[in-house]
C-alpha cells in the first residue's frame, strides 16, 4: 500500500506541516521534511494522538449542542467491535466532523442525508488486513480532489474504492452548477444636461454623446418626430432644437468667429462698448468729388499751397496719395484722388473710410451727370455732404442756379431752410478756402468723430505699389488705434512687420494715430487698394493669418467666374450662372437711349430677361466700366466711343464693350447672343454614294469593300449607311478610306476606293454606301 506524505496529512487535517513534524518527533518518529512519508504504524499513532486532542476540544461543543437540541444522547457513533476502527473517520456519519476546524467549515455547507456506507459493513466483517486496507482507502478519500463531505459543495456519501477521483470531479461540477449567478445590474442612465452648446451642426452620434443617451434612442425619437436620420448624418439647427425640446434640454448655438476675416475686427470695434474717457477727438477724413473740369484738382492744389503758406517753407513734394492740413490747431485729412479705385472699392464694401464729402460744382456749369453720380456715391456711403460752389470769379457764374438744381437731389441750402452747407469758393484764386475749412471742422464737431489711440491699429489701404529700392510699399490710413514701427501687421492678403513709416511730408515717424495717412514698408507682397489692415499681438499670428488669406485668395482666383461677354453668354446661361443679362446703355442723345432700352426689354428668350442697370448720355467713361465690372454687365454704346481710360479699364476688368451706329444691329446682337442658349439644330446632308463591287476578307482587319463612287464624294470623317435592296442594314462611321494603298481624306465621283466600316463586316457585293454629314442650321 502507498504511504502518506507529511504535507498531505497536514493538508487533510488543515494544520501546518511543521506541527505534524513536531507531533511525529514527540512520538519518537524522525522525519526529514514535509516531503517525508509516514508509514502505516506511524500514521496510526499520529491519528490516535490527533483524536485524543480533538475529543478534548470537542467535548464542550458537543454538550452545548445536546443541550440546545434537548437531546441527552451523545454524538451518534457507529458500533465498533474493533478498537482500531475508532480512528476510521469515514465510518462515522457523513454530517459529523472529526476536528473543530473541519466542523466549523462544514456548518455553512448544505445539509446532506446520512446513508450507511457499504464499505463500512464490508470493513466490519473483514479481517485486520481488510480493515487496514479500508483505513488507507478512507484516508485517500479525504485528500484534495476526493469526495469529502467536510468540503463545501462536496458529496456526503463516502467514496467507493478507486473511483474517488471521478467522484471528486463530479462533486466540483455539482458545486458549480448549484452556485447561482446574479446578473449584473444595468448602469443607470446619466441625467440629462440642462443645456448643450453646438456650433454649425451635430451628427446623431455627437448629439447622443452630449445628451448622455444611446444613438439608437435618438434615431427612434427623430423618426417619431418625422426626421429620418442615420448615426453619422448631420443634423441642422432645427432638428437639434426639435430633439432637445423633446428631452427638455436648452440649446445654445455657438457662432465661430473666423480670425482670418479682417472685417470681424472692424465689426467688433463698432459693436464693443468703449470707455468714453479713453476716446479722443480725431481729424476728419475728407474726400473731394465732382464733375470733370469743375475744379477738383485745382481745389486740391490750392489746399496744398495753403498748407505751404500756413506753416511750411518752400515747395513740398507729395510722396503719398493723402495728406493732412492743420488749421486752428486742428488737423484735416484729405484723400488726394477721391475718384480713384480705392474709394470706389471701399464704398462698395461699406467701409467708412471717409467722414465728409466735398461736392465741387462749377457755378457757370451747374449740375452734370458725374455730379449726380457723386451725390449717389456719398449718399450710399452715408456721409455728410458739403457743396463747394466753385468758379464764382467768372462773369457767367450763377450760384443760385446751382442751389436750385441741387434741391432736386435733396441737397437744400441752410439759407433756404435745409441742412446742407454751401460754400462759394474760387479754387483758382484761393477765395473762400478758409471758410470751406472752417465748415469742414464744424461738420466734424457735429459728427463727434472720436477714436481710441490706446489700442492696436486698424485701417484701410489707400494705394500700394512695388518700389524697386524699397520693395512693396503701401499707403495706409489709420482709422483707429496707433500704428508703431515693428508692429506685426496683416494687410489684405499680405503680412509683415512695419519696418519704416513716412508721413505726408516725407519725414520718418515712429508712430501715427487715428485718421493719419502713412506710407509703410516691410510687407511680403503688394496689397490691393481698398484692402483693410489689422495689427496683431505677435508676428506668428500675423504670419498664419496672412498665409491663410493668401491661399484662400489663390483658390478663389482660380475658381473665379469669367466676365460675361456676348461670346460666352450662352455658356454662362447653360451653367445656370445667370438668369438675366445686365446691360449698361450709353448713347449720344436721350431719345436713342430710351428707344434702345425699350427694345432690349422686349427680348425674352427661354425666360432670360434683359436687365438694364444704367443708362446715360455721353461717352463711355471709367465709372461705367467700374459699374459693369461690379455687376457683371455688358456695355452697349450707341453713337459714342469709350475714353482712353475707360478702354484701359475695360481691358483690365475684362468688361465687354459693344459699339453700334445702327440701333437694330445692337438689338439683333443681344438677341442673337441670348438665342445661343437654345440647343443648336442640325440637318443631315447627303454628300455622296458608292457601290460595293468586291469584298475582301482580311484577318485582323475585317471586310474591305472595294467601291466605286457613283455620286458626290466620300470623305474620311463622314457618317455612312449601308443600304441593301433599298433597306438600311447598318449606320455608322468609316474606319479607313484608302485609294490604292494610301490613306485618303476624300474620294470623288468616278474613282475607286477601299472602305472599311467600324464595327460592321457583313458587307456584300452590290451594297450601296451612302455618306452624309450633319450641318448646324441657323435659328430664325
Curated annotation (Swiss-Prot):
Residue numbers binding GTP: 290-297, 336-340, 390-393
Glycosyltransferase as UniProt keyword: no
Organism: Listeria welshimeri serovar 6b (strain ATCC 35897 / DSM 20650 / CCUG 15529 / CIP 8149 / NCTC 11857 / SLCC 5334 / V8)
Region (G5): 426-428
Pfam families, per database record: EF-G_D2, GTP_EFTU, IF-2, IF2_N
Gene: infB
All copies of domain tr-type G, residue ranges: 281-450
InterPro entries according to UniProt: EF-G-like_DII, IF2_II, IF2_N, P-loop_NTPase, Small_GTP-bd, T_Tr_GTP-bd_dom, TF_IF2_bacterial-like, TIF_IF2
Spans annotated as Disordered: 44-194
GO cellular component labels: cytosol
Family note: Belongs to the TRAFAC class translation factor GTPase superfamily. Classic translation factor GTPase family. IF-2 subfamily.
Sequence ranges of Polar residues compositional bias: 66-81
Biased composition (Low complexity): 82-93, 117-168
Keyword Cytoplasm appears in the UniProt entry: yes
Name of protein: Translation initiation factor IF-2
Chain segments annotated as coiled-coil in the UniProt record: none
Region (G4): 390-393
Region G2: start-end pairs: 315-319
Biased segments, Basic and acidic residues type: 53-65
Keywords: Cytoplasm, GTP-binding, Initiation factor, Nucleotide-binding, Protein biosynthesis
Highest classification ranks of the organism: Bacteria, Bacillati, Bacillota, Bacilli, Bacillales
Functional description taken from the UniProt entry: One of the essential components for the initiation of protein synthesis. Protects formylmethionyl-tRNA from spontaneous hydrolysis and promotes its binding to the 30S ribosomal subunits. Also involved in the hydrolysis of GTP during the formation of the 70S ribosomal complex.
Single GO MF annotation: GTP binding
Cellular localisation: Cytoplasm
UniProt region (G3), positions on chain: 336-339
Region (G1): 290-297
Amino acid at each position: 500500500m502507498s504511504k502518506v506524505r507529511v504535507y498531505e496529512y497536514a493538508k487533510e487535517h488543515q494544520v501546518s506541516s511543521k506541527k505534524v513534524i513536531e507531533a511525529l518527533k514527540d512520538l519518537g518518529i524522525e522525519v526529514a521534511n514535509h516531503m517525508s512519508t509516514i508509514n502505516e504504524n506511524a500514521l496510526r499513532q499520529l491519528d490516535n494522538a490527533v483524536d485524543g486532542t480533538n475529543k478534548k476540544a470537542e467535548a464542550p461543543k458537543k454538550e452545548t449542542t445536546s443541550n440546545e437540541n434537548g437531546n441527552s444522547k451523545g454524538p451518534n457513533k457507529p458500533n465498533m467491535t474493533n478498537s482500531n476502527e475508532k480512528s476510521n473517520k469515514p465510518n462515522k456519519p457523513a454530517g459529523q466532523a472529526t476536528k473543530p476546524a473541519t466542523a466549523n467549515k462544514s456548518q455553512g455547507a448544505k445539509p446532506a442525508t446520512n446513508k450507511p456506507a457499504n464499505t463500512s459493513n464490508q470493513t466490519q466483517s473483514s479481517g485486520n488486513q481488510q480493515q487496514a486496507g479500508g483505513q488507507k482507502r478512507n484516508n485517500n478519500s479525504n485528500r484534495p480532489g476526493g469526495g469529502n463531505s467536510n468540503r463545501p459543495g462536496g458529496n456526503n456519501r463516502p467514496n467507493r474504492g478507486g473511483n474517488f477521483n471521478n467522484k471528486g470531479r463530479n462533486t466540483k461540477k455539482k458545486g458549480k452548477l448549484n452556485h447561482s449567478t446574479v446578473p449584473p445590474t444595468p448602469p443607470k442612465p446619466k441625467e440629462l444636461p440642462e443645456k448643450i452648446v453646438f456650433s454649425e451642426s451635430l451628427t446623431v452620434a455627437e448629439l447622443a454623446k452630449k445628451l448622455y443617451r444611446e444613438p439608437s434612442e435618438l434615431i427612434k425619437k427623430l423618426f417619431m418626430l418625422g426626421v429620418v436620420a442615420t448615426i453619422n448624418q448631420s443634423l441642422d439647427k432645427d432638428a437639434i432644437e426639435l430633439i432637445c425640446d423633446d428631452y427638455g434640454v436648452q440649446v445654445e448655438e455657438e457662432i465661430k468667429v473666423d480670425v482670418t476675416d479682417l472685417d470681424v475686427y472692424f465689426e467688433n470695434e463698432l459693436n464693443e462698448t468703449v470707455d468714453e474717457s479713453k476716446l479722443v477727438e480725431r481729424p476728419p477724413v475728407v474726400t473731394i468729388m465732382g464733375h470733370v473740369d469743375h475744379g477738383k484738382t485745382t481745389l486740391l492744389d490750392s489746399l496744398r499751397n495753403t498748407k505751404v503758406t500756413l506753416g511750411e517753407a518752400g515747395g513740398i513734394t507729395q510722396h503719398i496719395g493723402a495728406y493732412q492740413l492743420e488749421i486752428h490747431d486742428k488737423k484735416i485729412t484729405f484723400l488726394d484722388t477721391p475718384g480713384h479705385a480705392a474709394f470706389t472699392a471701399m464704398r462698395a464694401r461699406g467701409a467708412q473710410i471717409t467722414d465728409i464729402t466735398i461736392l465741387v460744382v462749377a457755378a457757370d456749369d451747374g449740375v452734370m451727370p458725374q455730379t449726380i453720380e457723386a451725390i449717389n456715391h456719398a449718399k450710399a456711403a452715408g456721409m455728410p455732404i458739403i457743396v463747394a460752389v466753385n468758379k464764382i470769379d467768372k462773369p457767367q457764374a450763377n450760384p443760385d442756379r446751382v442751389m436750385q438744381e441741387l434741391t432736386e437731389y435733396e441737397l437744400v441750402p441752410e439759407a433756404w431752410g435745409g441742412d446742407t452747407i454751401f460754400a462759394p469758393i474760387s479754387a483758382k484764386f484761393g477765395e473762400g478756402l478758409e471758410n470751406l475749412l472752417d465748415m469742414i471742422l464744424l461738420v466734424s464737431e457735429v459728427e463727434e468723430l472720436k477714436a481710441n489711440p490706446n489700442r492696436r491699429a486698424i485701417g484701410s489701404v489707400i494705394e500700394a505699389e512695388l518700389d524697386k529700392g524699397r520693395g512693396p510699399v503701401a499707403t495706409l490710413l489709420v482709422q483707429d488705434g496707433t500704428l508703431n514701427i515693428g508692429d506685426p501687421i496683416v494687410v489684405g492678403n499680405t503680412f509683415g512687420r512695419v519696418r519704416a513709416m513716412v508721413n505726408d511730408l516725407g519725414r520718418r515717424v515712429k508712430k501715427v494715430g487715428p485718421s493719419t495717412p502713412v506710407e509703410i514698408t516691410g510687407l511680403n507682397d503688394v496689397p490691393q487698394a481698398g484692402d483693410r489692415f489689422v495689427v496683431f499681438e505677435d508676428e506668428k499670428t500675423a504670419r498664419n493669418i496672412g498665409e491663410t488669406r493668401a491661399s484662400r485668395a489663390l483658390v478663389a482666383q482660380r475658381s473665379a467666374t469669367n466676365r460675361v461677354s456676348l461670346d460666352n453668354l450662352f455658356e454662362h446661361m447653360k451653367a445656370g450662372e445667370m438668369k438675366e443679362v445686365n446691360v449698361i446703355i450709353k448713347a449720344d442723345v436721350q431719345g436713342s437711349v430710351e428707344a434702345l432700352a425699350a427694345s432690349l426689354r422686349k427680348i425674352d428668350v427661354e425666360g432670360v430677361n434683359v436687365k438694364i442697370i444704367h443708362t446715360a448720355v455721353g461717352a463711355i467713361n471709367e465709372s461705367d466700366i467700374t459699374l459693369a465690372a461690379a455687376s457683371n454687365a455688358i456695355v452697349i454704346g450707341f453713337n459714342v466711343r469709350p475714353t482712353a481710360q475707360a478702354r484701359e479699364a475695360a481691358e483690365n476688368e475684362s468688361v465687354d464693350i459693344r459699339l453700334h451706329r445702327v440701333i437694330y444691329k445692337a438689338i439683333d446682337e443681344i438677341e442673337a447672343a441670348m438665342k445661343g442658349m437654345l440647343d443648336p439644330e442640325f440637318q443631315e446632308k447627303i454628300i455622296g454614294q458608292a457601290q460595293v463591287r468586291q469584298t475582301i476578307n482580311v484577318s485582323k482587319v475585317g471586310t474591305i469593300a472595294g467601291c466605286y463612287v457613283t455620286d458626290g464624294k466620300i470623305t474620311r470623317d463622314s457618317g455612312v449607311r449601308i443600304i441593301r435592296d433599298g433597306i438600311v442594314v447598318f449606320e455608322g462611321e468609316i474606319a479607313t478610306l484608302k485609294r490604292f494603298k494610301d490613306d485618303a481624306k476624300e474620294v470623288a465621283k468616278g474613282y475607286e476606293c477601299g472602305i472599311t466600316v467600324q464595327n460592321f463586316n457583313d458587307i456584300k457585293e452590290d451594297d450601296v454606301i451612302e455618306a452624309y454629314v450633319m450641318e448646324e442650321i441657323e435659328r430664325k
